[in-house]
């Protein structure tokens, strides 16, 4: 669909010069917040985005995709991004990285800016708070990672399967008093689904569940390990490698050497520092490859949005 307005029209309606509109479109400095808001309001009102030909004339790539991670320091998300980038480069796309910090408001702002720049597509690392309404305009050119949504392409991890694999391995090793360190249920995947899988295994095998759900941070793992270590506990399952790193530090300080740790992640850091920990690989690298491939196929009209589930494997 052709834009009814040009950059010149937006400049006139906003009462600014064309160069100012260009700075706003490119998210450049040198524009006051008040002016930026005025220009963005006009663009939003008229549904404006720059044409591909206009971008090409400014020397910008005609093939751009965005990757919106939740945290730039996330070990798991970085593993997925590492396989996405080569896939995009190979097909001639220039990826740009953005961070949501688990904020739906930030995601909305990022998507608004990306729409105005008329980029080709988005890989969005999902989290609780991302609604279908928020991402609705991107249905044909967005892939959710680690979350799913009706009608949208998604690449998800087998959260229940990952915990079941760990619990089964520990059970086969003779452990019957297995505690769990996880994430609050407000996080549907890493939190609720993994905790529910732990509880389901305990119920099936008549084990007594002992769990704490502090959060995602390493420090939270460290601070809450004591609350799930009973006198008869022989193993501790952690919902993430980050929690396992915190738990391991606590166990070392307390000189507890007989307790078996297990975690979901199999990140390079955990394997290097603690090769003794039983880990499950949820397929972060494969998820990155699949997400990039799915987005490229959608951009080129070769497939419709679909849900992909990456199987977990014992590392």
Curated annotation (Swiss-Prot):
Residue ranges for the DNA-binding region feature of this UniProt entry: 7-26
Sample GO molecular function, one term: transcription cis-regulatory region binding
Alphabetized PROSITE patterns for the sequence: HTH_LACI_1, HTH_LACI_2
SMART domains membership: HTH_LACI (SM00354)
Keywords assigned by UniProt, alphabetized: DNA-binding, Repressor, Transcription, Transcription regulation
Annotated alpha,alpha-trehalose 6-phosphate binding sites: 71-77, 126, 147, 187-190, 194, 242, 284
Residue span(s) of domain HTH lacI-type: 5-59
Induction trigger: Probably induced by trehalose-6-phosphate.
BP-aspect Gene Ontology terms: negative regulation of DNA-templated transcription; regulation of DNA-templated transcription; trehalose metabolic process
InterPro entries: HTH_LacI, LacI/GalR-like_sensor, Lambda_DNA-bd_dom_sf, Peripla_BP_I, Trehalos_R_gpbac
Function of the molecule: Repressor of the treBC operon. It is able to bind trehalose-6-phosphate.
Subunit structure: Homodimer.
PANTHER family linked to this entry: HTH-TYPE TRANSCRIPTIONAL REGULATOR TRER, LACI-RELATED TRANSCRIPTIONAL REPRESSOR
Protein name: HTH-type transcriptional regulator TreR
Source organism of the structure: Salmonella typhimurium (strain LT2 / SGSC1412 / ATCC 700720)
Gene symbol of the encoding locus: treR
């Amino acid at each position: 669909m052709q834009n009814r307005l040009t950059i010149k029209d937006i400049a006139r309606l906003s009462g600014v010069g064309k160069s100012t509109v260009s700075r706003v479109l490119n998210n450049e400095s040198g524009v006051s917040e008040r002016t930026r808001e005025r220009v963005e309001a006009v663009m939003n009102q008229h549904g404006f985005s720059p044409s591909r030909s206009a971008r090409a004339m400014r020397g910008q790539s005609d093939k751009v995709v965005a990757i919106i991670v939740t945290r730039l320091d996330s070990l798991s998300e970085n593993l997925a991004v590492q396989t996405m980038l080569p896939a995009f480069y190979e097909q001639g796309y220039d990826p740009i990285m953005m961070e949501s910090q688990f904020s739906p408001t930030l995601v909305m702002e990022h998507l608004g800016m990306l729409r105005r720049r008329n980029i080709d597509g988005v890989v969005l690392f999902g989290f609780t708070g991302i609604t279908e309404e928020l991402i609705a305009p991107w249905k044909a050119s967005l892939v959710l990672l680690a979350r799913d949504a009706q009608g949208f392409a998604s690449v998800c991890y087998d959260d229940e399967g990952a915990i079941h694999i760990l619990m089964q391995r520990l059970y086969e090793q003779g452990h019957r008093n297995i505690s769990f360190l996880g994430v609050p249920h407000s996080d549907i995947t890493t939190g609720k689904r993994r905790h529910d899988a732990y509880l389901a295994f305990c119920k099936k095998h008549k084990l007594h569940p002992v769990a704490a759900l502090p959060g995602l941070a390493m420090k939270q793992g460290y601070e809450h390990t004591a609350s799930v270590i009973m006198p008869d506990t022989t193993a501790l399952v952690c919902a993430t490698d980050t929690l396992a790193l915190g738990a391991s530090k606590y166990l070392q300080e307390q000189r507890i050497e007989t307790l078996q740790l297990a975690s979901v992640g199999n990140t390079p850091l955990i394997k290097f520092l603690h090769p003794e920990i039983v880990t499950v690989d949820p397929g972060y690298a494969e998820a990155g490859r699949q997400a990039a491939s799915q987005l490229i196929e959608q951009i080129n009209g070769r497939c419709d949005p679909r849900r992909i589930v990456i199987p977990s494997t014992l590392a």
